[in-house]
Amino acid sequence: VNNTALSKALELNPATVLEMVRKLKEKKLVVTSADKSIQLTEKGKKKALLIIRKHRLWEVFLVEKLQFKWNEVHMLAEQLEHIASDDMIDRLESFLGHPGFDPHGDPIPDKNGKIKENIDKFNKFIFANNFWMN
């Protein structure tokens, strides 16, 4: 992806995205190529998967334990996913019974960033719909 596409997708000023990319490069989370495309490094991919993990675990918590509807939890999870404590996230996962999917049916990466890939769409559909049918 390039800076222009990223700024359109995020609905941000290109200068803002350029500054964000600069900071990500400093942290070695992204690299840019000669054609100006931006790609996650392995470190960046792992970091992204861990954020996705936190986000999806929080969505499960909000739906299962606090009785939010599955379509209400995304913005709340956006805020909660930035909690830095790995121990808290591990305890949250254990408290939730090690769920494999979020309320939308998307797989939750494990603490090593691995995603279960051998899941058929029917099982994902059933899992996702069990949340809001309760």
PLM features: what roles do these ranges have?
Residues 1-12:
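N-terminal helix-turn-helix DNA-binding core of bacterial DNA-binding proteins
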Residues 8, 25-26:
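Alpha-helical residues within the helix-turn-helix
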Residues 18-22:
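Short, hydrophobic-biased segments on the C-terminal half of alpha helices
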Residues 26-33:
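A short, conserved structural fragment
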Residues 36-55:
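Basic, amphipathic "hinge/linker" alpha-helix immediately C-terminal to the N-terminal HTH DNA-binding motif
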Residues 56-100:
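Amphipathic alpha-helical dimerization/coiled-coil segments
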Residues 82-134:
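Mid-protein regulatory/catalytic core that forms ligand/cofactor-binding pockets
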